[in-house]
Amino acid sequence: MRANNHFKDFAWKKCLLGASVVALLVGCSPHIIETNEVALKLNYHPASEKVQALDEKILLLRPAFQYSDNIAKEYENKFKNQTALKVEQILQNQGYKVISVDSSDKDDFSFAQKKEGYLAVAMNGEIVLRPDPKRTIQKKSEPGLLFSTGLDKMEGVLIPAGFIKVTILEPMSGESLDSFTMDLSELDIQEKFLKTTHSSHSGGLVSTMVKGTDNSNDAIKSALNKIFANIMQEIDKKLTQKNLESYQKDAKELKGKRNR
């Protein structure tokens, strides 16, 4: 009888131990490995050769861009700063002295800046990166004690949307002399991605042996690098000395009216 009771007691403890191990394992979240193989370089070298310097100054306003939620704040800031830096280089390459204005609003020009600036360049727009609905699938993990991975996955292709608008102004009057807009959805940029997130449930036993991969951040950086290069190439084509000097008559008239 004692042996029988001892066996039952051992079996009960073993059962409790097994249940505890199961509960512990089920409560563990699967590990997600986020790749970091792409650098946000935002490189561009002006294509045209340097031209003869002019005794004219161009005011360069800080870019006013909005971004989709999946673009990190640090990427937003770097994109904005690099845009201003490269446009400044493009204008200098075309023979102009550039005055960088720490504002996106033309109303913040000082009187001295309005007076000495031949032209002003303003930039605004929206930079959106979104999954292509036709080529993106989502797979959610089903709850379960054993075979649930506890990972939700979205796999597909990231594409750009939005626009960048560049406006050329006469600083004293604030009047627009010209503008051009780039439609980002027309760019041939397609970045494959796999985004993995933890499910609303913790997953089953198999989740402790599963490692998820998330390369969506690398896809975003790669897309931003390509968007940046395309934008700069177009700006480089438009902001030539020949084009900018064609506004001289209108700019002089507008500035003269305000000075009277």
Swiss-Prot record:
Signal peptide: 1-27
Pfam families with a match to the protein in the record: NLBH
Highest taxon of source: Bacteria
Record localization: Cell outer membrane
Cellular component GO terms, alphabetical: cell outer membrane
Gene3D superfamilies listed in its UniProt record: Putative neuraminyllactose-binding hemagglutinin homolog like domain
Protein name: Neuraminyllactose-binding hemagglutinin
Gene: hpaA
